[in-house]
Every structure is written in structure tokens, then in C-alpha cells.
Amino acid sequence: MGRTLYDKVWDDHVVDQQEDGTCLIYIDRHLVHEVTSPQAFEGLRNAGRKVRRPDCTLATVDHNIPTTPRKNFKNVSTFIQEADSRTQCETLEHNVKEFGLTYFGMDDSRQGIVHVIGPEQGFTLPGCTVNCGDSHTSTHGAFGALAFGIGTSEVEHVLATQTLLQKKSKNMRVKVDGKLAPGVTSKDIVLHIIGVIGTAGGTGCVIEFCGSAFEQMSMEARMSVCNMSIEAGARAGMIAPDETTFEYIRGRPLAPTGAEWDKAVEYWRSLRSDPDAKYDVDVFIDAADIAPTLTWGTSPQDVVAITGTTPDPSTVSDPIRRQAMERALDYIGLKPNTPMQEVKIDKVFIGSCTNSRIEDLRAAAAIAKGRHVADWVYAMVVPGSGLVKKQAEQEGLDRIFKEAGFDWREAGCSMCLGMNPDQLKPGERCASTSNRNFEGRQGAGGRTHLMSPAMAAAAAVTGYFTDVRKLTPAQQDRPASPTPKKIETELEPPVEDHAKAADQADIVTDAPATGASPPSPAPSDAAGMPKFTTLRGYAAPLDIANVDTDMIIPKQFLKTIKRTGLGTALFYNIRFDGATGEENPDFVLNQEPYRQSRILVCTGPNFGCGSSREHAPWAFNDFGIRSIIAPSFADIFFNNCFKNGMLPITLPQDKVEMLAEHAKQKAELEVDLVNQVVRYPGGEVPFDVEPFRKHCLVNGLDDIGLTMQKADLIEAFEAKRSQTWPWLDGKDYAGKATKFTPVATNTAKKQKLDW
């Protein structure tokens, strides 16, 4: 039987396979940043372990850094004002020096967002495996790479062993054929796809995007699509490499050359899915059905055409979906049936790992040219890397933006997640080219609407969500739309002064303290986990669908270099009043006996969707909750739970609702992992768990220690890899799996990469 693109890449990276199907796969490329790596390096240090393949590892700072001008930059210690952010960046600089890793610091023109710098350096190549402690690692799948985000425990695992323990996902194909309408971009396509299949539509799968719509895309457009495959619940997204791919890679600093290039291209051509390959899930979409699209709510699946209106929850029969829709409309400050083009905005963000590349900036500049940002709008453009910024300035794009009233910034993640100074204030509405519109994602109380760079630029110059086709040359002879009326959304008055708005964009505050109980013991950083056999206690009931990682632990609590102390941050935005820090008495964890909960029962599906950050399970562990029961889980969160000695249990909807009713009656539940049952007063419910994961939990085993027992298999694979795919090794690797070549952070831009 034929194989898919995913099958082929997976098969070429299996180091070992266990009886239950768990595989040890080799990781070719590892990207590291400041937020999800400190605890991983600490684990290596405590266990006396080294980084196995420095030549396959690349580090940079992106999430926490300011995007203000760097003309007076000396070092991160003096430049980054916010203490926790500064500590994370300083810690990364210390770690890359100690462990001998290549690092693009803030004084290096190559610094930028991890998922921008990997491709532009030629670090990302077709057919390779790519990991990063960031869920949008799926971006690199645009090259035909198997790329997926991992948690901090797995970051440590890759650093130590250059491998991961994984179960193979299902194959899913999303095919988009036909002629695209004018004004429709890759961002519109992927938002439309997510709207069709939902944020859990790809759960348990790797999506292969195919069809004429993707074949005609540039590499940068393909990256935007694969970037957001995680928002559809998929483990990864992939597009088969072709001539467009090869031309993009050719000549990049880390791309193969000469005979190696020819051999590489021959291999890359072989990766395309076979004609008779079988897929577990097939989705077909007519390109003609896709219009310029944006989000209306607080989930990437809450999408609507720019010509459409917000939905009406009263027409939805499913109570969980109706409740989620009502909650989203309430948070976003819009009423049912509101025309999207009548919604007034406050800010515009053009940037993020989804849309901060040169083509994105060109598209936005084409709309901005000759126009000006609306008087009440603050608009910012944040290039994805120093090299993108430099190229844009060479093309004069910066002048177009500045003349139009946009703020032209330095490279970084910026307002995508508001961990840095670039944030929304409560009530502010933002047209954003980023990838997530969760509650509080861009700042507490901020209202995020996702869209393409061209659509964001159109919103900036009109002050309202606008059909970009009205502003493009081919559409200028169309009759003008009626003057949009302002929608009353209970916003705070918008900032009128642009200088003042820019200053406010740089305000960041520390996480507020709370009076919650002290944290419970957490797993050791060095090795091993507490054993999990049985767990008895109160179970907190929660009736929310699509509980995302930003809801579980808001971004302001991610700026830590430890795994502990996060119990007070669990569900902070709905557990506490953001302004006063006072408890919300209506939230279940603030009620007795649920303050002592050891189990959580959530009746809504897709629990833990969103980021790969391991801070979410750390927060649960620190609070004292070690088991979560739900109808379904997002893949990365599900995996991260096991890495932290926690047990996520998937049960049918009716069983979850039954257990939730017992929880609401304040009855204790018992999770018996050994016998694989959940006991409740008068009965029990069986559950499934993978044998290897059960074995590790029951015995408190350390994945890294287990993997290191297979050193001979890893070494044999590396020898085969060097012979078969030599372009994947660093230039001076020569079989030396622990070679270190430190790169001093203050001279990185002057040194030639020793790969």
C-alpha cells in the first residue's frame, strides 16, 4: 500500500519501536527560546547531562523581548526593564554559553521569531523532524518537514538524547481545489478550514494540505497555513515539497550545496505522497467558497466572512456550544447578528510567526500606501526577524508604513501573546494577524480578531473591519458602502493621541499576588516522578468547552524559570478579579470542598487546546490536581500531563456528565490507574490508557533515563543518518555527538556559524 508524506518522514526517523506502538524517533532540528527552556536546561544540569547535538540546535530570544528601537542596546540586562522577562532572557544567554549552543541574541541581525529564523537560515529542510517548545512549530511543515511543538520536559529530552518517545498520529488530508476569489489569502484559507473542521477537527492527526490552492502558494504563504494547523487541533501540518520549496531553500546559509544539494533534492522529491496512499480522514473544500475571513469570537474556529455577521446563539440547539457562543460574544463585546464591517477598532497588530515575513509586510504596505491610519487607531508593524526588517527597509516598506501612521518596530513575538510590553488594554479591540484570539491573549480584557495582513491594514486605515477588496485597485470602481455606524460595545474611550498610545503599548505589569494556599510538592527537576497508582478526593466540576492553555494559566505567569509556584495562577482570569486580585466566589475552585480538589471533571470537549507550554500542567500539579477527566483533550496538553506525573482520562460524554453530577454533589471520586477505573458512589467507569504511559506513571519512571538505555540504537541511527542524509549534520559534526562550540552572545553577529 502507498504511503503518505507523513508516513515517509516518520518511517525514516524511527530509532526503536515498542510492542504497543510507542516509537523512539530522531529529531533533526531543535529550536530553543527563552520561555520554555529554562527548566529543561536546569534538568540537564541537575542530572549532569550534556546537549547531545549542539550542531542541530539553534536558540534565540523572541517571546519576552521589547520591540522598541535598539539603537542604544548594550545588553539584555540593561535593555529589558520587566524583571521576570529579563531573568528569562539572561538565563537563556547563560545556558547557551554553558551548553555550547548557537545563539542569535538581540544584537544579532539574525535574531527573530523562532519560526521565522529557522526557514530563512535554511535550518529547516524537507523531510526532517523539527521540534521547539512552542506549539506553532507546525509552521515548518510547509517544507514537508514533520514539525510539532513540545513541552519543556520533551525539550529536555531532545536536548539530552536528540530523540522523542511518540505514538504515530493518524493521517488527515485537507484538499482545497478551485479558483480563489480576489482578495483571498493563505490566512483566509486556513481560517476558513478551521471554521469548517473546528479547533478539535484535527485532534490525533497530522494534516497534509494539498490541492491547487496550496500548490500555487509561495513558501511564506504555506508557512502561514501550516502555522495554524495546531489551531485545528492537529499534531502537525505538512505540505509536500516541490520546486517552489527547493528554490526557496537554495543558497540559504545552512542549505546543502554541490553534490549534497543534488542528493538532497533527489530525496526530497521522493517524499510526495504516493497516488494510492490512504488517509484516515479526508476533507475537501472548494476554493470558491472562501472569502476574506476574520474571527468574531474567542476561538480560532469562530470565523465569519468579512461580509457576514456575528452568529445568534439562540439558533444553536447544542447547550454547550450555545453557552460557549454566548460567553464569546459577551467577552468580545458584540451582539448577535452584528455586521462585521460596522465594528470599530482601536488597535492593529501586523506581525507574529503567522504573518511577519516579507510578503506579509508587502501585502499590508500595498493597502497602506497613500492612505493614513484612522485618527483613533494605533497600528504597529513588527517584522519577524532582523533580516526581514532589513529587507523591508531596503524595499522602502518602512517609509510607506511610517508615512501612513504605523509604528515600525523591531523583531519579536510582540503583541501575539502580550508577554512583552506590547499589549492591549482592557476593552481594546484589535485587528491582528496573529494566530490565537483566546480571552486575554493579547492583554487582560483585550479583544482580538484574527485576519490577514491586508485585512488588518484595511482596518487600520478605515478604523473598522473592512472588506479589503474595497481598497484594492481591481475593486475601486465598486459602489461605496454605507458609512458604518459605531457598535456600542462598552469599550473604554479609545486613546486619541498616537504618542500616548505607543507609550501605553509598552506598559507591562507583574502578575498580581494572591492569597491562595501554598503550592503542593512538584516533581523533581532532575529525574523521576511521583508514582501514580490511585488518587482519591474531591473532583471539581467544570462546564466549559475548549478550555485553552491561556485560560488555564494566563501569559503573565509564564515568565518563570522554575516549574513550581504556579498553583495560584491556575484559571487566574476566571478565579480572581483582575483589578483587585479578590476571589471570584462563583468559580468552583474558590468554593468548599473544591479548594482541596485532586481531580477535575470537565464536561466540554477539547480540553487544553492552544499552546505547548508545560506551565498548564505545572499549575494543575502545584494546585494539587493530578487527574483531569474530559470527553477529549488537545494532543500536546494530553502528552504534557503524562510528562508531569498526571493522568488525563478520556471518557464518553455521558460518562463525563454522570461523574460531573457526582462531583457537584460533593462526592469523592477515586481514580485507580492500576485497574483502569474511576470509582464513584455506587459504581465505577473503566477507562483506557496506553500501556507504556501507564507503566511509566505507576512506576514513576523518567523518560530520559529510559531513553539513555538505548544509546547504542541512537548511535547506530546517527551513523546511518550521516551516511544517508549527510546534509542534516553540522559541518564539523563527524560523528561527535557531544561536540561543543560555544558562541559568545556579544559576538554572535561577528562569528561564522560552525555547523
From Swiss-Prot:
This is 3-isopropylmalate dehydratase. Keywords: 4Fe-4S, Amino-acid biosynthesis, Branched-chain amino acid biosynthesis, Iron, Iron-sulfur, Leucine biosynthesis, Lyase, Metal-binding. The gene is LEUA. Its cofactor is [4Fe-4S] cluster. Monomer. InterPro entries: 3-IsopropMal_deHydase_lsu, 3-IsopropMal_deHydase_ssu, 3-IsopropMal_deHydtase_ssu/lsu, Acnase/IPM_dHydase_lsu_aba_1/3, Acoase/IPM_deHydtase_lsu_aba, Aconitase/3IPM_dehydase_swvl, Aconitase_4Fe-4S_BS, Aconitase_4Fe-4S_dom. Residues 510-528 have a biased composition (Low complexity). Residues 427-446, 471-493, 510-529 are annotated as: Disordered. [4Fe-4S] cluster binds at C353, C413, C416. Its EC number is 4.2.1.33. Belongs to the aconitase/IPM isomerase family. It catalyses: (2R,3S)-3-isopropylmalate = (2S)-2-isopropylmalate. It is an enzyme of class 4 (lyase).
